[in-house]
């Protein structure tokens, strides 16, 4: 992989992992539409590490408080809003993990296609717009219940279909449940931590088993660029979210979906 591909793919991963526009779609499309070579397992691991480091850094205080209170409750301490949020993240993660494990081969064989990406980009983009318009936006993140987390978790499992957008569908579900934009986005980002960790770990195991060669210079560059892009994306997205809402991302998804439909027609 040349340096242009390294820079482009790392920045794409970092930006699209947390914006409601689908990282998987943007990583699949360069190979399918532009003929770029597959980035390989090692590079996949590298950009996942960069994205994971970015979201943990961006939410380091919240993550530290959640872990502290969750561990304390497990040892017999009192329940707190942070410990309950920890349980909510666990419950919200389970559906995607279980369904992904059961249907991985089906998804890889039948759903990683440009037409599927075009349809899901359009469909779930419109659903995001509807949720943003119709959601009551009354509940703060402290109002997250295990029932809400489970519903959002099943919505997150839909993001196994390329083009759906993990952040997009979880924010959509949270908005429809009445959460504020900030609460919906923050819970979506917290949910990303165990999933990115799991995905990166699985790819790491696959990399070790495959015996694939590692170009360390490329991996370090990919990790750093993915980290910087993801961290900036998270900070800017949260800062602008209440002002701009979801409409800019919906418009982008509609344009992208239409372009893809024309391309594959």
From Swiss-Prot:
GO cellular component terms, A-Z: plasma membrane
GO BP terms: cell wall organization; peptidoglycan biosynthetic process; regulation of cell shape; response to antibiotic
Main location: membrane
GO MF entry, a single one: undecaprenyl-diphosphatase activity
Spans through the membrane: 1-21, 40-60, 87-107, 113-133, 151-173, 188-208, 214-234, 244-264
Keyword Repeat in record: no
Xref: InterPro entries: UppP
This enzyme's EC code(s): 3.6.1.27
Pfam families in UniProt: BacA (PF02673)
Topology relative to the membrane: Multi-pass membrane protein
Cell location: Cell inner membrane
Catalysed reactions listed for this entry: di-trans,octa-cis-undecaprenyl diphosphate + H2O = di-trans,octa-cis-undecaprenyl phosphate + phosphate + H(+)
Keywords: Antibiotic resistance, Cell inner membrane, Cell membrane, Cell shape, Cell wall biogenesis/degradation, Hydrolase, Membrane, Peptidoglycan synthesis, Transmembrane, Transmembrane helix
HAMAP family associated with the record: Undec_diphosphatase
Sequence similarity: Belongs to the UppP family.
UniProt cross-references to PANTHER family, sorted A to Z: UNDECAPRENYL-DIPHOSPHATASE
Additional remark text: Bacitracin is thought to be involved in the inhibition of peptidoglycan synthesis by sequestering undecaprenyl diphosphate, thereby reducing the pool of lipid carrier available.
Record function comment: Catalyzes the dephosphorylation of undecaprenyl diphosphate (UPP). Confers resistance to bacitracin.
Protein name from the UniProt record: Undecaprenyl-diphosphatase
Native organism: Chromohalobacter salexigens (strain ATCC BAA-138 / DSM 3043 / CIP 106854 / NCIMB 13768 / 1H11)
